[in-house]
């Protein structure tokens, strides 16, 4: 059976035990296999709750009719461990994920838990550290790494166990712009090379702008879901819920207002620069 959607939520409702009102209310969305989807919204909108539901750390309200499907499996208490093998999460603070004395030990941790033979484990650790540009640090202590380097190691640890889906839960929010850009470029490359599905939970509009699809969450409900261009061209809607607009989308909006029509497939700074140069050369 061919699975087209890596993640699907149908009428998902969730209420925390100490809360009287649900934090998620009849949520419906799909994440296509092999795509990058960004989930954005203000604090308390329910973004991180969704990531915990996908990984089975939380379960939807009983008798609510909620259905969560991950990699073709309907999530329940019996198959939660099977689903967790399909999903890896990179959290905001990588220090909370380190368990090994060295970078190599840390990346090997998940493999050891799965009983992978040592020879295979050594090769896998070297391969995934090379994938994220951290092989030279295999014997380093995680505490001595920069924030960006720590996140690379965290990503390597996830890659080692070969998930189908990677959730970036505010995983670039503590990095400087340079470190953030490096991590996102690595993720984009690995997504293509390994056919990964990426769900990015973020406040960073520039990170969201790199996605194939954007879901806007507001007060436990989905406000909109479309391509980044479609979402951010609606300049008022993101601002109403406290989100800014990516610089390139602001610029495209202003150019369109001035009568310079920018094609919808122009989405990045480089694409806009190239289009404007071509436009200028025709004059």
Language-model regions: role of each:
Residues 166-169:
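Catalytic Walker B motif of ABC-type/P-loop ATPase nucleotide-binding domains
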Residues 119-137:
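Conserved ABC ATPase "signature" region
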Residues 2-6, 13-26, 59-62, 77-79:
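A short, flexible loop at the N-terminus of ABC-type nucleotide-binding domains that lies
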Residues 141-145, 149:
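Conserved ABC ATPase signature
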Residues 63-74, 83:
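Conserved ABC transporter NBD signature motif
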Residues 55:
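Helix-to-loop junction immediately C-terminal to a conserved catalytic motif
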């Amino acid at each position: 059976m061919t699975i087209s959607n890596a993640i699907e939520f149908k009428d998902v409702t969730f209420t925390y035990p100490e809360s009287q009102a649900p934090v998620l209310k009849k949520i419906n969305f799909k994440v296509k296999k092999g795509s990058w989807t960004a989930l954005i919204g203000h604090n308390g909108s329910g973004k991180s709750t969704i990531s915990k539901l996908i990984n089975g750390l939380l379960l939807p309200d009983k008798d609510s009719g909620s259905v969560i499907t991950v990699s073709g499996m309907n999530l329940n208490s019996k198959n939660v461990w099977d689903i967790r093998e399909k999903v890896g999460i990179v959290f905001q603070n990588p220090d909370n994920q380190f368990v090994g004395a060295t970078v190599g030990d840390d990346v090997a941790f998940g493999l050891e838990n799965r009983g992978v033979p040592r020879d295979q484990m050594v090769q896998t650790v070297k391969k995934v550290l090379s994938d994220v540009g951290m092989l030279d640090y295999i014997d380093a202590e995680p505490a001595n790494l920069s924030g960006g380097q720590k996140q690379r190691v965290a990503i390597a640890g996830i890659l080692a166990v070969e998930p189908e889906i990677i959730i970036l839960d505010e995983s670039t929010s503590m990095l400087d712009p340079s470190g953030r850009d490096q991590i996102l470029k690595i993720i984009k490359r690995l997504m293509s090379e390994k056919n990964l599905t990426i769900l990015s939970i973020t406040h960073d509009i520039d990170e969201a702008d790199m996605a194939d699809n954007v879901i806007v969450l507001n007060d436990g409900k989905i406000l909109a879901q479309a391509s980044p261009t479609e979402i951010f061209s609606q300049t008022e809607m993101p601002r109403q819920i406290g989100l800014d607009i990516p610089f390139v989308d602001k610029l495209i909006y202003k150019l369109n207002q001035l009568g310079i029509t920018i094609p919808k497939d122009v989405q990045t700074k480089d694409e806009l620069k190239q289009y404007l140069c071509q436009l200028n050369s025709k004059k």
